């Protein structure tokens, strides 16, 4: 029996800002640290399937920007077939800005970009 998986979904670059606490409305606070990583619900599912041994293909969209190139490379590094990921010349690659506090609570703001245009 073969394990073939096709995922249709979002592709984002996640940027996480680590903070001691969330700001009050109108308040500006400083992040303790910042990190970026591949993300998006669909991309995360495809990576999980591929790492579980499934032959995995992805259907989605990225922008024609450095973030899109980064995401295509990241998915390919996990042996995910990226031939069905379109490159959108008009919209940027999706992104998520994640604020994570010291208690592990988060707020997430997403820019859909090429994901929504698809």
Predicted regions and their residues:
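A glycine-rich helix N-cap at a beta->alpha junction
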Residues: 74-91
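Short secondary-structure boundary/capping elements
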Residues: 37-44, 89-92, 115-118
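Residue-level detector of anion-binding/catalytic polar loops
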Residues: 55, 81, 105
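Glycine-rich phosphate/adenosyl-contacting loop at the front of the ribokinase-like
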Residues: 1-61, 66-70, 76
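Short, basic and Ser/Thr-rich N-terminal targeting/leader segments
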Residues: 52, 91-94
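Conserved phosphate-binding/catalytic loop of the ribokinase/pfkB sugar-kinase fold
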Residues: 84-88, 98-118
């Amino acid at each position: 029996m073969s394990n073939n998986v096709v995922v249709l979904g979002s592709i984002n670059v996640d940027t996480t800002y680590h903070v001691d606490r969330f700001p009050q409305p109108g308040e500006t606070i400083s992040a303790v640290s910042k990190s970026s990583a591949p993300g998006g619900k669909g991309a995360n599912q495809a990576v999980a399937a591929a790492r579980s041994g499934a032959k995995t293909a992805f259907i989605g969209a990225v922008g024609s920007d450095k973030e899109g190139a980064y995401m295509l490379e990241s998915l390919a590094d996990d042996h995910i077939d990226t031939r069905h990921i379109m490159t959108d010349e008009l919209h940027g690659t999706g992104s998520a800005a994640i604020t994570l506090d010291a208690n592990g609570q988060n707020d997430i703001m997403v820019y859909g970009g090429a994901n929504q245009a698809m």
